[in-house]
């Protein structure tokens, strides 16, 4: 069974910085998950494909945490 998830993050500012900060995470290869990340204008689009629910949950926890931290760091930089 293949499980697919797609998330769109509309980012007002810093979209390019956030996108580029997350790109190195795609270099790591995993046996049961595959991820893609793209930037369309100011929207970050994350696609995750997993072989099972446990793998999907783990991958999403990691990716969502990374996106959240990147957004927080970008907003702190503006202060």
Language-model region placement:
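Short glycine-/aliphatic-rich beta-strand segments at the starts of folded cytosolic domains
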Residues: 1-11
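Low-complexity, flexible helical/coil segments
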Residues: 6-7, 40-46, 71-74
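Short amphipathic alpha-helix segments
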Residues: 13-28
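Surface-exposed beta-strand edges and their flanking turn/coil or helix-capping segments
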Residues: 19-22, 32-33, 59-62, 71
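Hydrophobic alpha-helical segments
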Residues: 22-24, 37, 65-66
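Amphipathic, hydrophobic secondary-structure cores in small proteins
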Residues: 29-59
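C-terminal structural segments of small proteins and small subunits
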Residues: 53-79
């Amino acid at each position: 069974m293949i499980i697919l998830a797609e998330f769109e993050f509309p980012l007002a500012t810093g979209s390019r910085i956030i996108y580029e900060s997350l790109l190195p995470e795609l270099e790591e290869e995993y046996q049961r998950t595959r991820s893609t990340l793209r930037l369309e204008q100011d929207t970050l689009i994350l696609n995750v494909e997993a072989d099972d629910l446990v793998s999907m949950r783990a991958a999403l926890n990691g990716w969502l945490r990374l996106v959240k931290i990147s957004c927080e760091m970008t907003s702190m930089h503006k202060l």
